[in-house]
Amino acid sequence: MTLDLTDLQQRLRAFAAARQWQPYHTPKNLAMALMVEAAELQELFQWLTPEESQQLTADPAQKERVGEEMADVLLYLLQLADHTGVDLRDAVERKLVKNAIKHPAPPADPASADGP
């Protein structure tokens, strides 16, 4: 799946404008809404064992709920990036480079060349 982030941001802008929500879509409010949606996603997994959490989306209804909450998180993140002028593509690329430096992969073990 390929997501066109710019297209999604434009659609979200139009959606909010059609409902006259722009005054409420401040960085503070969007960040707070993002956290509420992330908490709703977390709630689906909250009291599950690690094994149960890995199997949650085997149930189509639960998979739908998880997907909806993930979509809410992504949509608020896109709106927050749009309102703060953060280019998410650039931010992600820079962060991946930083993470690779901060957490380098261990040297390959010749004895395990076949993989796990």
Show where each model-derived region lies.
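Flexible "arm" and connector segments at domain edges
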Residues: 1-116
